[in-house]
Regions:
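Catalytic core of non-heme Fe(II) oxygenases with the double-stranded beta-helix
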Residues: 69, 74-145, 149
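Flexible, glycine- and charge-enriched loops at secondary-structure boundaries
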Residues: 45, 125-128, 156
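Short, compositionally biased
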Residues: 151-157
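Non-heme Fe(II)/2-oxoglutarate
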Residues: 1-74, 82-84
Length: 157
């Protein structure tokens, strides 16, 4: 008897453990994010972004054996108790040019969660909740719909 896995939904998550002396200045990253949103411009290149991007791409390549290529870079800020609209980072009519994965990173977050929806064969409508905390990443297939929730009532996330 043999078994062949035809499809799987892989989720990758964990802390960004930068080497000593190469820590990411999340305040600078947050400032760049806010400036890009206020000015309605693309997320700017910065030393912090390059360090984070390089770490994540190399970590995924070494640990999981595949390479990531950036398609689109953006950041969001959520008001207290705000829940995002349903997010899906693919274009259903142009799957060839859509990203394979969505990667979220917690820049300066407090009590934030991500709900990722998926189907497991006949069991549709399943979801998985995971906390998004400071300096943590979550990566999953871009074909999965997700929500981001700012659970606390005091500040922006």
């Amino acid at each position: 008897m043999e078994k062949k896995v035809l499809a799987e939904i892989a989720l990758y998550y964990g802390d960004v453990a930068m080497p000593k002396g190469f820590e990411i200045n999340r305040d600078k990253l947050q400032s760049d994010l806010l400036k890009s949103q206020i000015n309605n411009k693309e997320f700017p290149y910065s030393r912090e972004w390059d360090m984070l991007n390089t770490y994540l791409r190399e970590h995924i390549n070494v640990e999981h054996g595949f390479q990531l290529i950036n398609k689109k870079i953006w950041g969001n800020v959520y008001k207290p108790k705000e829940i995002s609209v349903p997010l899906l980072n693919i274009d259903p009519v142009d799957l060839r040019n859509s990203p394979d994965y969505t990667l979220l990173y917690g820049v300066n977050v407090k009590d934030c969660s991500v709900k990722i929806h998926y189907a497991a064969n006949r069991r549709a409508g399943r979801s998985w909740d995971i906390a998004l905390t400071n300096n943590k990443f979550i990566m999953f297939p871009s074909t999965q719909m997700y929500y981001i929730t700012n659970n606390q009532k005091d500040s922006l996330n």
